[in-house]
Amino acid sequence: ANDRKVVSILGAQGGPKLTLPTTTTPIDPATGQPSVTEPAIPVDLTAKNFLITGTDNGACIDPDSPYAAAFGNRNGLGERADTLMILRLDPKTNAAAVLSFPRDLWVRINGKKTQGRINSAFNRDDPNPLIVTIFDNFGILIDHYVNIDFCAFKEIVDAVGGVRVPFATPVKDKNTNLLIEQAGCHTFDGEEGLAYVRSRHFRYYDAKTKKWIEDPAADRGRISRQQDFLRRAIQKALDKSAGNPTIAKDLIDAALQYVILDANLTPGKLLELASAMKNLDTSTMKTYQVEGTGKMVGELSVIEPRLKTDNMKAVLAVFQGRARLLDAPEQIFELVTTTVAPTTTIATATTVQPSTVVGQAAPPTTKAPRATTTTSTTSTTLVPVYVESNSVGILPTNDPACR
């Protein structure tokens, strides 16, 4: 696309070097068959980290849309980082995982001693302060950068023909004007999808009590739904472009009208990546969140990262390139993981029982004996983990037919 916007990012110097040279035969767009005249193109199968930021601007919202009141008027607010996540892709094994960063994480900013909320390091057109912040606090190197604003989100969702999400009950959020009145498989278009992934006061209808119940996991529940939506959107794109490089190119061209990428993430590399990851089963994609404990810093309610638990160390090792993506553990959420100051009521994973929460993972139980896990990529023995859950909050049901 002629309007493609690119930025320069810091190189991942000293990062994991796992390049496994191979080749693939180019596809002739005219016939859809392997080309017999062009030489094979080298494909980089190194596992890579993609920093994905979502920004909340008011552009591209139809003023006649039922969601315009919730998103359309953002004059004077600028663009803020509403979503921060790292997508790690391993083309060699067709594996993927996502690590999300709550925007209120209290961290050192841009390699300095000064602390602030992690989203204060965000600059849409210069991701390097955020990249430095992530490395300085979490030891994770970034290979590529993707910024998705409202326009890009709408374009991507609409380009794949909408994203289907299954619900066991009606759901709503009056703040974003989201209202799904019927249980079942619902297809989101771009604008309605925005209302869903941005929902912070997500409610579901309890038929027994005949009441609307709000997700007690608050912002972490929203993050879990964003991760689930991303997984479904990727699967929809893979399904739509399966075996057809022309459709894959069309989808990429549609997205590139609005997204901002690092200069090295060219359309050609995106097509190469799409081809290499075509067999990805997104139902196996692991999803994680940086854990933390709520606290007050002056008048600010922030989250102090909690990185020293065995489980969080094992999760970070995957994104640091010290453990194989295929060996990624499940995430064990500790009891106190909240954006609310300790002086207020804290909503934890045990606040609401699974019998009353649609799609919520069972609350942590007493710990079972742990087994040692060893990764083949290094000689280091990873800290042991025990599988309990890898998401929190009100989530869609697991319906493989809804995709």
Protein language model features and the residues they cover:
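Soluble non-cytosolic domains of exported or imported proteins
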Residues: 77-81, 112, 120-129, 147-151, ...
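C-terminal solvent-exposed extensions
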Residues: 62, 114, 258-364, 382-403
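Second-shell loop/turn segments in exported
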Residues: 72-75, 115-124, 139-144, 183, ...
